[in-house]
């Protein structure tokens, strides 16, 4: 992934006393992903079911990884025909296996009968809720602890577990 930043500057004679006279816009190009392994995913939020998901790494020399569409894959492997969106779980992992993910709201469950009130999203706010939103990596068994947002309410914490048993780059020898 490449990024480019452009700055737009408003001439001083056209600005007001409030607001910004400069706006920066960053444009990102998607990464090239290559499959490096698989992980056994267990959904501790909605179903308790398990599935095998692909693990991919960005080829552009980063420590950027993703678990590919865990909920969609789980539904498909368990014979469901109504599938949620295919949201990937993207994260960085350093050479010691420490994992970080951008804070944010990630829609993971929509279009199925599990959520009657609409869409459900992972509400990952590790700065605001450090005891409830975090990653734990025990030699490739990765647990995501997160809150769940349905409408305007938060629930949890809940966990997703990924046993990265095929292709984990930092396995103990």
Tell what function each PLM region has.
Residues 2-8, 140:
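Exposed beta-strand face motif in extracellular beta-rich ectodomains
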Residues 10-14, 148:
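Surface-exposed loop/turn motifs at beta-strand-loop junctions within extracellular Ig-like
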Residues 26-173:
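Ser/Thr/Gly/Pro-rich, low-complexity flexible regions
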Residues 9-10, 43:
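Short intrinsically disordered, low-complexity segments
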Residues 13-22:
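Short, exposed coil/turn segments at beta-strand boundaries within extracellular/luminal domains
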